[in-house]
Design a protein with these regions (language model features):
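Bacterial N-terminal signal peptides
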Residues: 6-15
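Short S/T/G/P-rich N-terminal loop/turn motif that feeds into the first structured element of a domain
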Residues: 16-100, 104-122, 132-151
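Acidic, polar ligand-binding/catalytic clefts
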Residues: 125-126
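Positively charged n-region of N-terminal signal peptides that target proteins for export
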Residues: 1-4
Length: 151
């Protein structure tokens, strides 16, 4: 029963982090409103910084170690299969239950394509079932500045 609840909670967190909100702008300056584009590069990609704070493990299941294993084992590969670039994955040192990662996309439309493919991928469903980790999610959409080394 606990495993089923964690899977349901994990699905809910993904849905909450990706739905019900107006899409935040990101990508090249030419695709952004004037209020966002003044300092954004014409060749900027869309970056997404995501922070997942894992619930504590219960009876050895779930928790930050299972979340890292899920990423290590296949989650990164599934995103890359659907066209995202996983720029980096970090362990927060001031909050050891939080994994931070950054993805890059060509633009907002590409992000939508990547997430649709990821969500529909049977490998993701199997991985989520294998490592049912309840997480709270913070996500930020960004475009690189016109003077950034990272484009």
């Amino acid at each position: 029963m606990r495993k089923i609840m964690l899977v349901i909670m994990g699905l809910g967190c993904i849905s909450l982090a990706n739905a019900g909100q107006a899409p935040q702008p990101c990508g090249p300056a030419g695709q952004l409103a004037d209020e966002f584009s003044a300092n954004v590069g014409s060749d900027a990609r869309c970056f997404e910084l995501r922070m997942y704070t894992a619930e504590a493990a219960v009876n050895g299941e779930g928790g930050i170690n299972d979340l890292h294993q899920r990423f290590r084992e296949e989650e990164v590969a599934i995103f890359e299969k659907h066209g995202a670039e996983v720029v980096a994955v970090w362990q927060r040192l001031d909050d050891p239950n939080t994994l931070v990662w950054m993805l890059a996309y060509r633009d907002r439309a590409h992000r939508q394509e990547v997430w649709a493919g990821f969500a529909a991928d049977p490998a993701w469903a199997a991985l989520r079932e294998k490592y049912p980790v309840g997480v709270s999610i913070e996500a930020y959409m960004m475009s690189s500045t016109n003077y950034s080394n990272l484009k």
